[in-house]
UniProtKB/Swiss-Prot annotation:
Keyword set, alphabetical order: ATP-binding, Cytoplasm, DNA damage, DNA recombination, DNA repair, DNA-binding, Nucleotide-binding, SOS response
Protein name: Protein RecA
Listed Gene3D superfamilies: P-loop containing nucleotide triphosphate hydrolases
Pfam (any one): RecA
Function of the molecule: Can catalyze the hydrolysis of ATP in the presence of single-stranded DNA, the ATP-dependent uptake of single-stranded DNA by duplex DNA, and the ATP-dependent hybridization of homologous single-stranded DNAs. It interacts with LexA causing its activation and leading to its autocatalytic cleavage.
CDD domains: RecA
Length: 372
């Protein structure tokens, strides 16, 4: 670049910083915040699948899945982990269904948890925006997008049609929220439900509620599914769960994690430690016996899990070794984040192009009908 152009650029950058504040424009290579702060999901396998050791602060996250798949349980686990780090969390309960006893059983400090049970979707998202703008709240959870009912729908008659009202509400709210989320470094988690698209012959008929805006604005999207029942004898004591990282702008996407959710207790951390320890040769398995550092820790998985519960120091040591082995180093992670963001931008551009083509096709069909 010539000296004159460099001087003009420096002058423009200086003017932008004076007018809009320091950090309003910078060179991407100078930005060291790509090594993003994160909070654990409560599942070691999922933390590893996410690539940065958990869910990222300063981003929008969407967790979706069928009913009773563990969506709210996972967000409560995130709150419990964040509170251990001294973070402030808020729960916007649009479904009016949060159980404080269950939350406490999962390790949530209910005395410190902020909770709101709004009457309308507009109120819920306005509360969410105010909490984010305060800069004093680290995690805001909205449960769920499907329950964010627009005011016009609540005040209207039961049979009234309100086409696209919720999608417009979400689109407007996310436009307001995203810049504030980045500035305040707040994580905003939206829980979402699944619906079926009518008349889909090929491809996946499933979709999430609230339109397409959340899909584009989310840095991380998690698809959580119940894959089976966990039994002790004839009694069902929990779920086998699979989580797929459908979208990830901070690390490579499409990784999966499998873990167990125990009723009344949450994610089985000890079960994951044993499974991952065996997989990566840190825990030895000979027949039914499990050994760690040459010492037998139990016969059968259930007894080995109990041993780790009774010996938290050994469990923490094993977890530390697994995290050190499987989580990428900061320099590598910075490169991965850039690559992941480029890939996510391409995917978003493809999705937008498809949506534009569909709209254009529908418009042409309408024109043909009107001409005929």
């Amino acid at each position: 670049m010539s000296n004159d152009r460099q001087k003009a650029l420096d002058a423009a950058l200086g003017q932008i910083e004076r007018q809009f504040g320091k950090g309003s424009i910078m060179r991407l290579g100078d930005n060291q915040t790509l090594d993003i702060d994160s909070v654990s999901t409560g599942s070691l396998g999922l933390d590893i699948a996410l690539g940065i050791g958990g869910l990222p602060f300063g981003r929008v996250v969407e967790i979706y899945g069928p009913e009773s798949s563990g969506k709210t349980t996972m967000t409560l686990e995130v709150i419990a982990e964040a509170q251990k780090m001294g973070k402030t969390c808020a729960f916007v309960d649009a479904e009016h269904a949060l159980d404080p006893i269950y939350a406490e059983a999962l390790g949530v400090n209910v005395d410190d948890l902020l909770i709101s049970q709004p009457d309308t979707g507009e109120q819920a998202l306005e509360i969410c925006d105010m909490l984010v703008r305060s800069g004093a709240v680290d995690i805001v959870i909205v449960d769920s997008v499907a329950a964010l009912t627009p005011k016009a729908e609540i005040e209207g008659e039961m049979g009234d049609s309100h086409v696209g009202l919720q999608a417009r509400l979400m689109s407007q709210a996310l436009r307001k929220l995203t810049s504030n989320i980045k500035k305040s470094n707040t994580m905003c988690i939206f829980i979402n439900q699944i619906r079926m698209k009518i008349g889909v012959m090929f491809g996946n008929p499933e979709t999430t509620t609230g339109g397409n805006a959340l899909k584009f604005y989310s840095s991380v999207r998690l698809d959580i599914r119940r894959t089976g029942a966990l039994k002790e004898g004839d009694e069902v004591v929990g779920n086998e769960t699979r989580v797929k990282v459908v979208k990830n702008k901070v690390a490579p996407p499409f990784k999966e994690a499998h873990f167990q959710i125990l009723y009344g207790k949450g994610i089985s951390k000890e079960g994951e430690l044993i499974d991952l320890g065996v997989k990566h040769k840190m825990v030895d398995k000979a027949g039914a016996w499990y050994s760690y550092n040459g010492d037998k820790i139990g016969q059968g998985k259930a007894n080995s899990m109990k041993f780790l519960q009774d010996n938290p120091k050994i469990a923490d040591e094993l977890e530390g070794r697994i995290r050190e082995l499987l989580l990428s180093k900061p320099e590598k992670r910075t490169k991965e984040i850039r690559e992941a963001e480029r890939a996510a931008a391409k995917e978003d551009a493809k999705s937008e192009a498809k949506a534009d083509k569909k709209t254009e096709k529908k418009g042409n069909e309408k024109d043909d009908i009107s001409l005929s």
